[in-house]
């Protein structure tokens, strides 16, 4: 859901790791947008064989470096959104450092 991408700062085609809490699989994949307001996360490609509807997932992204190897953005703060079983965001966790 592009709304969720905006909420947590994910970019289209950004590499992410998907930690499947249900079965322990940890595929690396990339982000593709779903329609705003769809409240959906979809795992496609090879990663789709490692997840099932209803699995609990943790999606992790990492910092980026510019052409001068400077960290972008200059200030990084984790932003975590918790999703309920009906795929609604219900809580935000910030600044876990």
Feature annotation, model-predicted:
Residues 35, 72-97:
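Helix-rich terminal scaffold detector
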Residues 2-68, 85-86:
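Compact, glycine-rich, soluble single-domain proteins
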């Amino acid at each position: 859901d592009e709304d969720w991408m905006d909420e947590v700062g994910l970019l289209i085609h950004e590499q992410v790791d998907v930690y499947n809490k249900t079965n322990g699989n940890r595929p690396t994949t990339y982000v593709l947008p779903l329609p705003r307001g769809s409240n959906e996360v979809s795992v496609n490609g090879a990663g789709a064989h490692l997840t099932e509807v209803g699995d609990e997932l943790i999606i992790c992204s990492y910092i980026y470096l510019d052409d001068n190897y400077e960290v972008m953005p200059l200030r990084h703060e984790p932003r975590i959104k918790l999703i309920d079983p009906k795929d609604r965001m219900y809580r935000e966790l910030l600044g876990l450092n």
